[in-house]
């Protein structure tokens, strides 16, 4: 089943801050296996498949007529990148920061000496974790399948997972009866 969100980050789009994305995912047996997230303003493309891994391509405006997956992969950076950081990075929603998220961040600050908080919009947050620029993205507010499926596929292909907040160690599932 294909899951498409043609404008993820509607609030960010309206605010004109550039933090909106186009998300496309392929889900098989409830698990996202292919994901594509495009950031039109930044001209960045994140893409992944369980067979090929996760990648980021910067500076993309259009695809050439002879573009192939091999050419895209060759021009891209494999995720996660090996980024050396001296702090624990939490990425949180710019528009959906809840008291539960704030409590989670406070708990992280008790565990780690240096904590940096990055606020971002839309599925960019999942991409930042998959890329290795952030350690965790806590989200306790309700979300829809089209908000997470593409990013989830990218995270999985980068060796990470997205779990249900109320059921620790249970990955998100897709194509459920109740959205």
Name the predicted role of every residue range:
Residues 32-36, 87-89, 134:
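Short, hydrophobic/aromatic-rich segments at coil-to-beta transitions
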Residues 49, 58, 83, 94, ...:
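Residues at the C-termini of beta-strands that transition into short coil/loop
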Residues 54, 79, 172-174:
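Short clusters of hydrophobic/aromatic residues that line enzyme substrate/ligand-binding pockets
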Residues 73-101, 107, 111-120:
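Short loop->beta-strand "edge-of-pocket" segments that line small-molecule binding or catalytic clefts
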Residues 1-59, 66:
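DPxDG-like acidic metal-binding loop motif
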Residues 9-10, 90, 129:
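Buried hydrophobic positions in well-ordered alpha/beta secondary-structure cores of metabolic enzymes
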Residues 66, 70-72, 102-111, 118, ...:
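Oxyanion/phosphate-interacting regions
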């Amino acid at each position: 089943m294909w899951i498409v969100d043609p404008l993820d980050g509607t609030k960010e789009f309206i605010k004109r801050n550039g933090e909106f994305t186009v998300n496309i995912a392929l889900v098989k047996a409830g698990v996202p296996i292919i994901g594509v997230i495009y950031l039109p303003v930044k001209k960045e493309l994140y893409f992944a498949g369980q067979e090929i891994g996760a990648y980021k391509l910067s500076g993309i405006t259009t695809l050439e007529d002879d573009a192939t997956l091999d050419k895209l992969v060759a021009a891209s950076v494999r995720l996660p990148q090996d980024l050396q950081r001296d702090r624990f990075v939490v990425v949180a929603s710019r528009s959906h920061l809840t008291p539960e998220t704030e409590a989670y961040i406070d708990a992280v600050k008790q565990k780690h000496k240096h904590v940096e908080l990055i606020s971002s919009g839309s599925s960019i947050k999942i991409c930042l974790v998959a890329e290795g620029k952030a350690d965790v993205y806590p989200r306790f507010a309700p979300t829809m399948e089209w908000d997470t499926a593409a990013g989830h596929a990218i995270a999985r292909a980068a060796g990470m997972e997205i779990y249900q907040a109320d059921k620790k160690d249970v990955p998100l599932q897709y194509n459920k009866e109740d959205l």
